[in-house]
Amino acid sequence: MSNFPWLTIIVLLPISAGLLIPLLPNKGNRIIRWYTLGICLVEFLLITYIFCNYFHFDNQFIELKEDYNWINLLDFHWRLGIDGLSIGLILLTGFITTLATLAAWPITRNPRLSYFLMLAMYSGQVGLFASQDILLFFFMWELELIPVYLLLSMWGGKRRLYAATKFILYTAGSSVFLLMGALTMGLYGSDGPTLDFENLANRSYPIGLEIILYLGFFIAYAVKLPMVPLHTWLPDTHGEAHYSTCMLLAGILLKMGGYGLIRINMELLSHAHSIFAPWLVVIGAIQIVYSALTSLSQLNLKRRIAYSSVSHMGFVLIGIGSTTDIGVNGAILQMISHGLIGAALFFSAGVTYDRTRTLFLNQMGGIATSIPKIFTMFSSFSMASLALPGLSGFVAELMIFLGIVSSQNFSFLFKVVIIIVAATGIILTPIYLLSMLRQMFYGYRIIKNLTSYVTDAGPREIFIFICLFFPIIGIGFYPKLVLSLSNSKVESIISGNFSSK
């Protein structure tokens, strides 16, 4: 226990420090870069300190809970806390954001605003995962929108305004359902309004209302996850955004949807979740295959990786829909694993673009000998993405399959069909990833005289590569590093709300 407001500090520190960026000396970008990187490092060290000193692996309850009165009318409090669902994603947020800040160093146009927006995203993401108030959860959810929109529209590619507008329309439009659901849950009942997750977990709703609430929240999460057919904003966004922004999107932003499904839909609306769980599994299986096939047809490198992300998030839907301990833990592991792998792939694509000045696979070829270090790391991360044994993706997908097999909520025929469909997606994954590597690095060199003006990865880029690769290997060989964080909490959710384990 601690009376010190640790969580409030880690939520407010990045955005508060970002407000000081305009006061820094205007002597090039060096001071701004190091200042922002220093803030990110301090934040990540604080998160690590909190994890090491105040998080207990066998505790299923909220720890370090902070509750400060904010708006009395709606019982709107500044409520924060950590548990097994949130701590892993908070650590992932700190890790990926720090590396994304380092990856953004080549940005030279208006770096003050760029780094401030990244720090604002940092606060919003940590705040969302630490929120214990449903309206505060919505507030942090919305805090992401403007920074991403500006990062995309100001530092994106040729079609950046189209992609940014599409992003804001999809995400802001779906957020209306999140707000309506949050207010309805908070105001429902005769015992007065409450927005506290702990109190909401003890409330019951008429099944019709619970289904409506579930669907409202689900629409918001389906856009962020993203879920087919609400996914079309993601390839456009990734295709136009700077690769440091892509790292934040793939590494953290998509995980907000999966986290919301577990935190609110599964934990607070368990009866409705039991009804819709088979549909989550079906949609997840279809998404895996559809996105894999679509990825195979993409000539743009970043769009191919984006569709790969959509495909991999289909496994998260299947794991959450399985309503089993091993399946839900597998979904959480998949979110963290993909957060690392997705960020790594987009960084690899970005540094490759910095050298070739093209993202189109049919304009590359034979560049492996010119950039062997980038080739090695790009290939390694692609192997992780196709779930090679010994790397993090393999364990997560295996657990999700075991979750479906062990579930008592589905018929044998249903399980067989889902496994066959999902396995088809797994077969397609190495096809589109290996063909991507072949088109980029092997064959005839299309870009002439590449070696005369291109250098391989430098110290900064190699450092980012190594920092991303070690956790992928570590989780692959010892997945208990992540599973021990969420196991107790997931077990309490399943045993308390669902009959099948």
From Swiss-Prot:
It is found in: Plastid, Chloroplast thylakoid membrane. It comes from the Eukaryota. HAMAP family: NDH1_NuoM. Its EC number is 7.1.1.-. It holds the Pfam family Proton_antipo_M. The keyword Plastid applies. It comes from Anthoceros angustus. This is NAD(P)H-quinone oxidoreductase chain 4, chloroplastic. It catalyses: a plastoquinone + NADH + (n+1) H(+)(in) = a plastoquinol + NAD(+) + n H(+)(out); a plastoquinone + NADPH + (n+1) H(+)(in) = a plastoquinol + NADP(+) + n H(+)(out). Belongs to the complex I subunit 4 family. PANTHER family: NAD(P)H-QUINONE OXIDOREDUCTASE CHAIN 4, CHLOROPLASTIC, NADH-UBIQUINONE OXIDOREDUCTASE CHAIN 4. One of its GO terms (cellular component) is chloroplast thylakoid membrane. Keywords: Chloroplast, Membrane, NAD, NADP, Plastid, Plastoquinone, Quinone, Thylakoid, Translocase, Transmembrane, Transmembrane helix. One of its GO terms (biological process) is ATP synthesis coupled electron transport. It is a multi-pass membrane protein. GO terms for molecular function: NADH dehydrogenase (ubiquinone) activity; ubiquinone binding. The chain crosses the membrane at residues 4-24, 37-57, 87-107, 113-130, 134-154, 167-187, 207-227, 242-262, 274-294, 310-330, 331-351, 364-384, 385-405, 416-436, 462-482.
